[in-house]
């Protein structure tokens, strides 16, 4: 059965519901989505190389998906993000929180992404194993390195990862991650 997505305006006000295929065809319909920035104590963020119908083989943050409408209920961002981490990396019990959102439109052929995208963050220091059904691979990278790579090669990242990383940089958590990475580098040079 096809997933039902939650249609919203640019301020995340619910306007209705539509099948996933309708939301991603032509100009699509603006719907709820999220991208997850998973970080560790070293100040690194988890990146995955996507294996999806849209924007495949590009770098993404740790996970991205949509809150769903099912059995008359709307899945919350937190519930959807927890589902995503379980499905994509087998991770459970991570404390995840929304720190911001942005709107974007990204066409690809006759399909598109047209999303109000929440940036969700969580800390994780354990081992990671990507689900080979949804990712070609993954890597940890500092936020500074990721932002530099986005500037050098923007086409190698999905649009929502580029926008999410830039939003993270402006947030107090992003500033802390940048500082943590700098402190670790300075300590290793002593």
Residue ranges and their predicted role:
Residues 1-35, 39-42, 50:
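Acidic, metal-coordinating catalytic segment for phosphate/diphosphate chemistry
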């Amino acid at each position: 059965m096809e997933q039902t997505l939650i249609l919203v305006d640019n301020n995340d006000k619910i306007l209705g519901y539509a099948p996933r295929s309708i939301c991603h065809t032509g100009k699509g319909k603006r719907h709820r989505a999220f991208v997850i920035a998973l970080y560790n104590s070293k100040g690194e963020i988890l990146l995955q190389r996507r294996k999806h119908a849209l924007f495949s083989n590009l770098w993404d943050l740790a996970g991205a998906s949509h809150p769903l409408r099912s059995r008359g209920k709307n899945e919350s961002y937190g519930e959807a993000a927890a589902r995503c981490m379980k499905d994509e990396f087998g991770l459970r019990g991570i404390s995840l929180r929304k720190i911001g959102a942005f709107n974007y439109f990204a066409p690809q052929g006759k399909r598109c992404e047209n999303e109000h995208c929440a940036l969700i963050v969580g800390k994780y220091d354990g081992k990671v194993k990507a689900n080979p059904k949804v990712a070609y691979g993954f890597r940890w990278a500092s936020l500074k390195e990721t932002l530099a790579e986005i500037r050098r090669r923007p086409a190698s990242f999905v649009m929502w990862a580029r926008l999410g990383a830039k939003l993270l940089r402006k947030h107090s958590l992003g500033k802390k991650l940048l500082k943590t990475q700098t402190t670790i580098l300075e300590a290793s040079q002593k």
